[in-house]
A protein has these predicted regions:
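DNA replication sliding-clamp ring fold and its partner-interaction surfaces
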Residues: 1-15, 59
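Detector for the mature cores of small, proteolytically processed
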Residues: 15-131
Length: 131
C-alpha cells in the first residue's frame, strides 16, 4: 500500500487530510499539498524519538490502529498507553522490531479547524539488548 493511499484512507476515516511528520519536521513531501501556512494542519503526527525508516508497513499499522478506535474519546492525558510491535527495516543495519506507544490521539479543534492528531513514540525493542 502506498503512502498516498494511506493518506486517502485516513481522509475518509477522519474527514480531514493528515500531515505526516517525522521528528516534528520531516513531512515526506505530503504536507505542502494539504495545508496553506502550517497553522491549520489536519494532521497525522508520527513523532519518533529515534531515527527509523518510516516505511508503508509502519504507516499501515498506525492506520489500522486508528480504524479501530473511538477517536474523540482518546484525546486525553488520562488515556493509558497503547503498545504494539511493528517491524521496521533500518538503512545500513539489521532489521529490528520496535515497540510503538500511542501517546494520545483524537479529534480536536485547531484555529477553528477540526483535526485528527495521533502522537506516537517508538522505542527500540529491549529484547535486542544483550544481558
Amino acid at each position: 500500500m502506498k503512502v498516498k493511499e494511506l493518506v486517502s484512507g485516513l481522509k475518509k476515516l477522519t474527514g480531514c487530510y493528515p500531515v505526516v511528520l517525522m521528528n516534528g519536521e520531516e513531512t515526506l513531501g505530503l504536507s505542502r499539498d494539504f495545508h496553506n501556512d502550517g497553522s491549520d494542519w489536519a494532521q497525522l503526527s508520527l513523532v519518533v524519538r529515534k531515527p527509523m525508516n518510516l516505511d508503508t508497513e509502519f504507516l499501515k499499522v498506525v492506520l489500522d490502529y486508528c480504524a479501530r478506535q473511538e477517536h474523540h474519546s482518546l484525546f486525553s492525558d488520562e488515556t493509558p498507553f497503547e503498545e504494539f510491535e511493528v517491524f521496521a527495516s533500518q538503512k545500513e543495519s539489521e532489521d529490528a522490531f520496535y515497540t510503538i506507544k500511542i501517546l494520545k490521539c483524537g479529534m480536536e479543534r485547531v484555529n477553528d479547524v477540526e483535526v485528527f492528531a495521533l502522537h506516537v513514540e517508538e522505542i527500540f525493542d529491549t529484547d535486542k539488548v544483550n544481558d
